């Protein structure tokens, strides 16, 4: 609705013409009180992201609550927890009915800008949620039912880097411990070792790192320079592991067979 008193000056008249032109482009009548047919759901997104910006550039815009209700920015709560060798990521959409959550996640993973609910509301995904989706796709996460997604625990560091500090994200205690141990292997508890040799600090760190990876079911490669004691670190690690499991497959050059044969638990 335009204020008729604004037609008193040439400046306002020129402004009115701009407003009328914008109204016509948006499907309204060029009148002081203008109407247009109801927006279809697929048109709501364009109306709010493009048409409304044009109106705002011309003056103050007030939007009724009923119209605002058709367009909502969706920032779901995200919960991450460990499930065995996997990470489970749950999405809780506040404005989406439970029966539509899987369709909303599909729209998010297909990089759509918005999702249209059965009630006709246009739900726009916020930028942070879209970044999370892109990361999960790169990690080849698998969509399940009920807003759940699973991926390997190896993704813990990437997810922590992206999601740390976001108010809508919660981590289980198990996930927090996993991410911390991956970042701080030097603080992992050193197991009881059955070796007579005294390990240097960096060798002890290597054993802690191997032990931490083994604890979470990961694998790793010691890549020190030659002569820094990779064989000793491996033997020390195996003395701890073989107390719990009597089986270990060792592939080694023939020059190391004697050293490895001295492992006794």
Residue ranges and their predicted role:
Residues 237-260:
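Conserved SF1/SF2 helicase motif Ia
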Residues 217-235:
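Walker A/P-loop
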Residues 18-22, 26, 37-219:
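Charged, low-complexity
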Residues 4, 17, 225-226:
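Generic detector of well-ordered alpha-helical packing
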Residues 205-208, 236, 262:
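Generic recognition of well-ordered alpha-helical segments
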Residues 5, 215-217, 244-245:
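Short loop/turn elements that form and flank the Walker-type P-loop nucleotide-binding site
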Residues 1-8, 12, 263-264:
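Single conserved hydrophobic/aromatic residue that forms the stacking wall/gate
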């Amino acid at each position: 609705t335009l204020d008729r008193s604004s037609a008193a000056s040439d400046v306002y008249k020129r402004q009115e013409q701009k407003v009328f032109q914008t109204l016509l482009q948006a499907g309204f009548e060029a009148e002081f009180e203008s109407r247009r047919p109801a927006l279809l759901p697929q048109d709501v997104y364009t109306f709010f992201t493009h048409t409304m910006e044009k109106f705002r550039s011309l003056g103050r815009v007030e939007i009724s609550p009923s119209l605002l209700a058709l367009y909502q920015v969706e920032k779901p709560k995200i919960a991450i927890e460990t499930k065995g060798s996997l990470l489970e990521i749950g999405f809780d959409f506040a404005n989406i009915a439970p029966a539509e959550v899987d369709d909303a996640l599909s729209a998010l993973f297909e990089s759509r800008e918005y999702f249209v609910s059965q009630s006709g509301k246009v739900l726009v995904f916020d930028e942070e949620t879209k970044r999370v989706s892109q990361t999960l796709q790169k990690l080849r996460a698998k969509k399940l039912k009920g807003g759940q997604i699973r991926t390997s625990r190896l993704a813990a560091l990437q997810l922590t880097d992206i999601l740390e500090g976001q108010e809508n994200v919660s981590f289980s205690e198990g996930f927090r411990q996993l991410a911390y141990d991956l970042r701080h292997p030097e603080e992992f508890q050193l197991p009881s070792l059955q070796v007579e040799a005294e390990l240097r600090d960096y060798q002890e760190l290597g054993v802690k790192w191997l032990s931490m990876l083994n604890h979470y079911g990961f694998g790793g490669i010691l890549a020190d320079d030659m002569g820094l004691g990779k064989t000793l670190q491996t033997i020390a690690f195996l003395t701890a592991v073989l107390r719990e499991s009597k089986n270990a497959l060792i592939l080694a050059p023939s020059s190391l067979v004697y050293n490895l044969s001295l492992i006794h638990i």
